[in-house]
Design a protein with these regions (language model features):
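Cyclic-nucleotide recognition modules
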Residues: 50, 100-164
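Cyclic nucleotide-binding regulatory domains
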Residues: 42, 67-129
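Short aromatic/basic micro-patch
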Residues: 45, 103, 135, 202, ...
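Short loop/turn motifs at secondary-structure junctions and domain boundaries
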Residues: 52-53, 69-73, 193
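Cyclic nucleotide-binding regulatory module and flanking cytosolic helices
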Residues: 6, 15-65, 109-110, 114-117
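Phosphate-/nucleic-acid-contacting segments
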Residues: 12, 189-254
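Polybasic "coupling" helices that flank or enter modular domains
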Residues: 146-213
């Protein structure tokens, strides 16, 4: 672990050497963090020199659907940012049972609480679509947290917002009935992921069950009931919300 005993950043490049990947050839598609349109919003608090430090210590990788970006239990040597595509974050439970936490979107920081607890990834991240991702040396993050108060506060806000969202989900999953839980998921994809009432359902029925804590058969049955009652239209992977007010009511009443 690297510790820095001063608060200014005049000699940052003498402390952290730019990322060296040995003999592996890597071509970055993003020219720099400064010009990236999908960069994490908290980077706005960095000085130009600090942002250059981040840029010098990152590398990009492209993943196909189904490939693992981060593995639960592996070392947290890097922070992950997605430049494009969608991925699922999930806990690998016992007996092959997974619990999907959220859908990872471009421009978001992917860094679990384990980074500051046991230096292990708390969950697995797998690509749903083709994904272009940036990996940034976690020691750079530790350094910036120590020397840049605004950046540190932004990181705390990010982690706190995710923790609050997870707590809310846990309460809803424990207190709502199956119809309410599935309504929550459909609204999540509409409001957060796609921002549209009509979208391609990127999760299988099995994965929807892993997200809502119910069996695949229950997901199929409730989707059919919602369609028969005119609340949604469902055709293979396509979902269209026809009666948003009714779906919200189902979500609220659980």
């Amino acid at each position: 672990m690297i510790f820095v005993s001063f608060a200014d950043t005049r000699n940052l490049k003498t402390i952290f050497k730019p990322f060296n990947n040995g003999n592996m050839s890597v071509v970055n598609l993003i020219s720099s963090c400064e010009t990236c349109t999908r960069r994490w919003k908290n980077f706005q608090h960095l000085t130009k020199e600090e942002l250059n430090l981040v840029n010098d210590n990152r590398y990009e990788a492209t993943f196909k659907p189904g490939e693992i970006l981060m593995k639960q239990g592996s070392p947290t040597s890097n922070a992950l940012f997605m430049a494009s595509g969608l991925a699922k974050t999930y806990i690998e439970g016992q007996n092959g049972k997974n619990f999907i936490l959220s859908i990872a979107l471009p421009g978001r920081l992917i860094l679990g609480p384990g980074a500051y607890v046991d230096s292990r990834h708390t969950y697995t991240v797998a690509a749903i679509t083709s994904v272009q991702a940036c990996f940034i040396n976690f020691e750079i993050f530790r350094h910036l947290v120590r020397v840049n108060g605004a950046f540190a506060e932004g990181l705390l806000e990010d982690i706190s917002a995710k923790s609050l969202g997870s707590l809310t989900r846990m309460v809803n999953l424990s207190q709502k009935k199956m119809h309410g839980r599935l309504a929550d998921a459909l609204l999540y994809f509409s409001d957060i992921v796609f921002k549209n009432d009509e979208y391609e359902m990127i999760l299988s029925r099995q994965e929807l069950g892993e997200m809502t804590n119910m069996a695949k058969e229950c997901v199929v049955r409730i989707l059919k009931e919602l369609e028969d009652s005119g609340v949604i239209y469902s055709d293979s992977s396509k979902i269209k919300i026809l009666d948003r007010d009714k779906l919200v009511q189902i979500s609220v009443k659980g």
